[in-house]
C-alpha cells in the first residue's frame, strides 16, 4: 500500500497561497511613497501645512516623516480590488526609516548597502568592448565623402524636380482668385 500524498496547502494548515498569507510582510517603495502622499493630503485637510511642499531631499521634509511615524501604528493600505483585505503598516517602521534615509546616500552607497544586505559582495562587472562599439567610433560614411556637395547632387537639381501642382489648378503661392483669372484669360 502506497503512502498518502500530502498537499502543500495541508502542510501550511490552510488553503491560502503563500503570497496572500504573507502579504503583510511585503511592503514596496511605491507603497511607502503612496502613504507619504496620503499623509501630506491628510495634513493639508487638517490645516497643518508646515512643510507640506517640502521635497523628500529637503530638511523640512522631516515634518512629514515624523507625522508618518506617529500614525504608523494605525495606518493601513487596502490590498486587492475587493477592498476587504488590508495591509497593516505598524510593523514596517524599519522599512520606512530605511527608505527615508536613502536621501542621504549616493547611488553608489545605496548599491553597496543593498548588495551587502543580500550577500552580494562582488563589484560590478567591467565593461567589455565589442566590435559594435568600434564600428560606432568610426566616422560616418557621409563625413568621409564630405567633398561632394549636397547642392551638386543630381537629386537637388531643379531640372530633375517635378513641379508641384496644387489642388484645382492652384499653384503654391497663388490665391484662388488669381487662378480663376488665369483660367479665364486662357479660355
Curated annotation (Swiss-Prot):
Residues 1-24, 119-187 are annotated as: Disordered. It holds the Pfam family Baculo_LEF-11. One of its GO terms (biological process) is viral life cycle. The keyword Hydrolase does not apply. Keywords: Transcription, Transcription regulation. The keyword Transcription applies. Transmembrane segments: none annotated. Belongs to the baculoviridae LEF-11 family. Involved in late/very late gene activation. This is Late expression factor 11.
Amino acid at each position: 500500500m502506497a503512502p498518502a500524498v500530502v498537499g502543500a496547502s495541508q502542510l501550511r494548515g490552510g488553503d491560502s497561497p503563500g503570497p496572500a498569507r504573507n502579504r503583510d510582510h511585503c511592503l514596496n517603495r511605491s507603497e511607502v511613497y503612496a502613504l507619504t502622499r496620503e499623509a501630506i493630503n491628510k495634513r493639508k485637510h487638517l490645516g497643518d501645512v508646515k512643510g507640506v511642499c517640502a521635497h523628500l531631499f529637503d530638511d523640512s521634509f522631516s515634518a512629514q516623516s515624523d507625522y508618518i511615524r506617529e500614525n504608523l501604528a494605525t495606518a493601513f493600505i487596502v490590498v486587492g480590488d475587493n477592498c476587504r483585505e488590508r495591509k497593516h503598516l505598524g510593523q514596517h517602521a524599519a522599512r520606512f526609516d530605511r527608505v527615508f534615509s536613502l536621501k542621504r546616500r549616493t547611488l553608489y552607497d545605496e548599491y553597496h548597502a543593498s548588495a551587502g544586505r543580500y550577500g552580494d559582495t562582488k563589484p560590478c562587472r567591467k565593461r567589455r568592448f565589442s566590435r559594435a562599439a568600434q564600428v560606432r567610433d568610426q566616422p560616418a560614411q557621409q563625413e568621409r565623402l564630405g567633398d561632394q556637395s549636397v547642392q551638386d547632387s543630381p537629386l537637388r537639381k531643379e531640372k530633375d524636380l517635378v513641379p508641384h501642382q496644387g489642388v484645382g489648378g492652384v499653384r503654391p503661392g497663388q490665391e484662388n482668385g488669381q487662378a480663376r483669372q488665369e483660367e479665364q484669360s486662357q479660355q
